Regions:
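Short, well-ordered coil/turn segments that N-cap beta-strands
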Residues: 59-62, 91-95, 135-142, 167-171, ...
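Alpha-helical scaffold segments that flank or form the walls of functional sites
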Residues: 73-138
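Conserved, mostly hydrophobic/aromatic
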Residues: 67, 96, 143, 207, ...
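Catalytic pocket-lining loop regions of alpha/beta-barrel enzymes
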Residues: 33, 190-325, 336, 354
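Mid-to-C-terminal alpha-helical segments outside catalytic/metal-binding sites
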Residues: 12-14, 24-62, 78-86, 94-95, ...
């Protein structure tokens, strides 16, 4: 691939350096330089523009983006207009699923109820999109919010409040369990083994009772915990994020082959749980540690497909197209590639699939697992 992968050799993954002035590459604002993995940075639009637009592959193929965020964070605004500006660069997006990101929580009231503000906020965005004034895509036709499932039985009224606030769009919860003992790895969970706690499973039972799904998020080292959760709660609808949480920095740097083997074994075992689906994507430099930001320009779709193909094809082989669904993870993955090239890369990886398999991967599985019309 053009550019480089940071490390001692092309298979080694280490913490990347930042873009330098003397290379002619643009700098990001002070405090925003992408000088380490595991962090979210504001996308550098000038750097992204260094890659010429690509022709759109299979432009008529309907796409449901199963994982994106909407936020104003550290001065970075990514709301309906910004998302639709990316969408307008190509591909046939028909609808999308919003994933919780601690956006617009209520400023007061009981702490456990404050995340309802995010659902209220996104439902307003979704209503704007549903008006048709902003075009044909139906943004946030599914909403995945946050509720603390370790509240156990006490989480039910919170879930019911989300349902009321969601205007018929609320589909489930993401309660992240990703945790690593090394402090360099950014954790979403405040404690290890969150998914093994009896209180969490009691909360999941309440979620399942209400017909809602759980977006699970854990690192590949924790997939045994997700397997245990899926087996213990066979009626739960679990959707695993980001190809199963690959890591390639910190203690995992320079160990790509070792990590791949361990990840593949766990993903294959996870796929034996029929109540689990797998999202395909979310592997930009933040987690898998491909050092795209050290390149003079973003990768092409061919380059990205070459890097991601082993991971995505492994997931599809294990789960099958009817339990896999593509995701943009924007604006997080926009740190390393533009919208049009990202979806071109997914289409290149799926090029050998049948028409029915492509339908499942790009929209059909999403309609089923998120109960979208």
């Amino acid at each position: 691939m053009a550019g480089r992968v940071s490390g001692q050799d092309e298979n080694a993954l280490t913490i990347a350096g930042r873009r330098q002035n003397d290379s002619g590459r643009s700098e990001m604002p002070q405090g925003q330089q992408p000088n380490q993995f595991g962090r979210i940075f504001t996308p550098d639009e000038a750097w992204l523009a260094r890659r010429s637009p690509e022709p759109i592959l299979e432009p008529g193929l309907p796409i449901i983006d199963t994982h994106h965020h909407l936020w104003i964070r550290d001065g970075h605004r990514y709301l309906l207009d910004e998302y639709l500006a990316d969408v307008a660069t190509g591909h046939n997006l028909v609808s999308s699923v919003f994933l919780q990101c601690h956006s617009m929580y209520r400023a007061d009231g009981p702490a456990e109820m404050r995340p309802i503000g995010e659902t209220e906020f996104v439902n307003g965005i979704a209503a704007m999109s549903a008006s048709g004034v902003f075009g044909t895509p139906r943004v946030a036709s599914g909403i995945v919010g946050f509720a603390d499932l370790t509240l156990g039985d006490r989480v039910e009224p919170i879930l019911e409040a989300h349902i009321r606030a969601g205007g018929g769009r609320f589909r489930g919860v993401r309660d992240s369990g990703n945790y690593d003992a090394d402090p360099i790895i950014g954790n979403g969970a405040s404690e290890p083994q969150r998914y093994l706690r009896p209180e969490f499973r009691a909360g999941l039972a309440r979620l399942t009772k209400l017909g809602l799904s759980l977006d699970a998020w854990a690192f590949f080292t924790q997939l045994d915990e997700v397997i245990d959760l899926a087996r213990a709660c066979p009626d739960a609808n679990l959707i695993m994020g980001h190809c199963g949480g690959l890591l390639g920095y910190g203690p995992y740097a320079g160990k790509r082959d070792e990590v791949f083997a361990a990840w593949k074994a766990r993903v294959t075992e996870l796929a034996k749980c029929p109540n689990v689906s797998m999202k395909l994507g979310g592997m930009m430099m933040r987690l898998a540690a491909f050092d795209y930001l050290a390149m003079d320009a973003p990768p092409t779709s061919e380059e990205l497909a070459a890097h991601w193909r082993p991971y995505i094809e492994t997931c599809i082989a294990a789960f099958g197209p009817n339990r896999c669904l593509f995701e943009s993870n924007f604006p997080v993955d926009k740190m390393g590639i533009g919208w049009a090239a990202l979806w071109n890369a997914f289409k290149r990886i799926a090029a050998g699939a049948s028409a029915d398999e492509k339908t499942a991967l790009f929209n059909g599985t999403a309609r089923r697992v998120y109960r979208l019309t």
